[in-house]
Amino acid sequence: MTKDELMNLVNRSLFATIGYTDEMGRQNVRRVFCVWHKGLGRHLISTNTSSAHVKSLMKNGNACLYFSDDSAFEGLCLFGNVIVHFEREYRELLWNEGDEKYYPKGIEDEDYCILEFIAESGRFYRYDGKGDLSAPEIAAFDAGREYENGYHAANADS
């Protein structure tokens, strides 16, 4: 798959699966709403600060993020680290009308945080082959990009 094809897979995915190690050393996965991307290497996820995965990621940020399209038999697993953000600029970027249902105190709710996944490498597959992504390849592809809602852009014509 080309990097543009991988970016298309990421953008048309409404959800991703994040893998991490919990505080007891067990491997865990969570399905997360993940539509904000800065190329292939950076992804933003809004979530509850009180959730178990956030507590674990604050102690050990090593994680993987998996995007897939089961109907096309395509997948991309990115390996990297997570930073937990509480800064208003991140919260505002991902805040949506109706989020008050989950965060009653609004954008400043202490239970509202943003995970920033930063990829260091990746592995992809498709029916016609598989391959690896290195940190320099990801950085070159992502150069000059800003965060954008890729799902919205990919599905604007729908």
Please tell me what each predicted stretch does.
Residues 77-158:
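Charged, gly/pro-rich active-site loop segments
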